[in-house]
Amino acid sequence: MLIVKKYGGSSVATPERVRNVANQIIEDVKAGHQIVVVLSAQGKTTDQLIARAKEMNPNPSKREMDMLISTGEQQSVALMAITLQGMGYHAVSLNAFQVPMHTNRAYSNARLKAIDTDRMEAELERGNVVLVTGFQGINRYDDVTTLGRGGSDTTAVALAAALKADRCQIYTDVEGVYTADPRYVSNARKLDEIGYDEMLELASTGAKVLHNRCVEMAKKYNVELEVLSSMVKAPGTIVKEDSLVERTMISGVAADKNVARISVIGIPDMPGRAFNMFNLLSKENINVDIILQSVGRNGTKDISFTVSQDNADDAVRVLEENLRRLGAQDVTCHKDVAKVSIVGAGMTSNPGDAAKMFEALYNADVNIHMISTSEIKISVLIDVNKVEEAVVSIHEQFRMYEKK
């Protein structure tokens, strides 16, 4: 059996944890499996490298930043190979150039385009554990690129798809996917399994276990994922195609504090102005989530929308630079907000879900600023200091602690 395993930075943050992961790998080798391991940079290595760069230059180029921070993953895979070799097992570390993994040119947020599996397959045939750097690739000019948030998860799924692996295991510091963040909800329940679509919505609404890009790729190539803890030996959560077509239940509630609300005030109420505004943001690769347009008055309207806090300053800059072109009066930005979402199959056939969610928020004295809905998700924007009360109340209202 060919298994792709991915370990995050916290799982390899210390020498003891590196040896713990090495022992887990050895267990699978002893069982006769071929193993490919994707590793993130250890602990806070990436943050430290970014800080060092900004000491030298507050506005470093994205190309050089990718060159710098990619060294964190190279340290991880080399140290793991050294550890396994010291324990008597064959292992080889490969970076993105050696695999190779090809991406587009978008430094700091590249997309994987193709993976050559010949080198990895040859190393597996030689009996090696293959350790691959996560989070990075190379573009057509042989420059190093990084994949942005969730890049190591995405690397693991892409390798599993390319190698036609039998299993793809994502190891984290929690035991699986829960109905809510256990830090907020003490009786949050671990899910045995969840469908791609629901996991994708949870990932994109604040659940930190898997990144949405990783889930998108898993769904596209039908790669079944197993989310496990690297610290505790226990069954995890399987993420796969949902076969329960008529299932109507809430899978979980998630909160995302990496949100900012931007409002563009006094836009002329005429065709094309919203297109112009969002087209400007699109050209800067700024993703927009919840959108609210006010009722027009005196020939103008206000448009509010949410972006990640990472993109908020860039979004405000772009809009302020184009205020006259848009015909708008002002731009405001609020970062003291958060998005709380419930996710579950069959919401459109169960109209009571929205009412129950809003009742839970009312009971917790939580004010709603914006609302967004889809077939399997309802999201609200609230004050960030009310997140815990909101999540706890919603989890209790839907009795998510009970196994359905």
PLM-predicted stretches and their roles:
Residues H33, Y89, V223, I286, ...:
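Short phosphate-binding/catalytic loops that engage adenosine nucleotides
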Residues M56, G236-K404:
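A conserved regulatory-domain signal marking ACT and ACT-like small-molecule sensing domains
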Residues C214, E224, E241-S243:
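Membrane-embedded hairpin module used as a gating/binding unit in multi-pass transport
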Residues S40, S230, Q293:
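Conserved H-loop
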Residues A218:
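Acidic-aromatic/histidine active-site loop/patch
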Residues V223-A234, K257:
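Active-site C-terminal subdomain of aminotransferase-like
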Residues M1-V215, I382-D383, E402:
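Nucleotide/pyrophosphate-binding catalytic subdomain
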Residues R167-Y171, L225-V227, D289, M370:
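Short hydrophobic alpha-helical runs that function as membrane-insertion/retention elements
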